Amino acid sequence: KDGGKNWTKMTVNQLPGVPESAFVNDIKADLFNENVAYIALDNHKFGDYKPYLLKTTNGGKKWTSITNGIPDNTLVWRLVQDHVNPNLLFLATEYGVYISFNQGDKWHKFSNGLPTISVRDLAIQKRENDLVLATFGRSFYVLDDYSALRDISESSLEQEGILFQPRTALQYQPLIGGTSSQGASFFTSKNPEYGALIRYYVKEDHKSTKSKRIEKEKALKATNIPFPGWEALDNEMVEAGNEAIVVIRDMDGNVIDQLVKPLKKGMNHVNWDLKQPFGTTVNANSKRKTIRTWRFNVKGGTYTAQLYKRVVGETTQLSDPVSFEVKRIRTNVLTNPLANETEAYTQKLMALSKALSQTEHAFYKASKQLE
């Protein structure tokens, strides 16, 4: 507490519940409170794979175990604290990453695409709010812009759905499809998708009627399984899949786009490409009745995103609208003096395209009837 002039010795066996043979993997001082610190230890060299993770709130005088939610056979390696929200902690373990929203009182497994691997180190890139993971022999992983996690608490996880604040979306024209002429020396990872990244949380899965029936039949494995009936099976075949829907609107409340993904429990994300559907045209000459959709760039400004779910054909609102900005990536250039005129012309062209599509479809149906 005096800049390193004086030290107080503390041995491992002074920590409650920690064997004296345990090895100290990490010690972290709290970024916001000088009396709070965290320590991670392991004793696997002696056949002990328990997680030893402790916290002090009085400068090391007393330590308390904070392993609620971490399985008994999970070694802990590193801990990092968010630099904005003091309650948000990340923990690297032998079997992936865990996250806490209340300073370690409770931990949650945080996989979301991360394989079950040994994560040995963690670092936070503060400028971009990225979480960087180093694994044991399985490369590096980066969680891009985790700032949405700062808005989560244990109580908010009980909500049916949450849509998080998107960051400002920068608008530009991508010119290359992600690769170049590097031949055999081409090694790369995917960049974040172009557009507005929208993250959302869904509390529960909603299983289809077929999935529920199959679960019941599994429980009847040792007995005769009743036949559900042809009508019930037909209804299962035509039942619409459960979906999460993010509706994009402009500030006038006009629907600009709808982003649809399968409804899944936990943290999810969808990417809006900052474009608006131009219109659809039914190709009447095609046996497949192909529907072609064009999309054009939206103008910069304020937009809103709102989360819905569709379960067995019924749509329910899960969140209030959340606003975000769309801006040009280059701000030191001249603006288009005809932007409003271009927008009005595009809207007129969209209406004309829609009318043309409807006319073409009506003509196609009439011609089929005459045949």
Language model: regions and residue ranges:
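Beta-propeller blade termini and top-face loops
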Residues: K1-F186, E193-Y194, K203-D205
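Extracytoplasmic/secretory ectodomains and luminal regions
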Residues: S153-E371
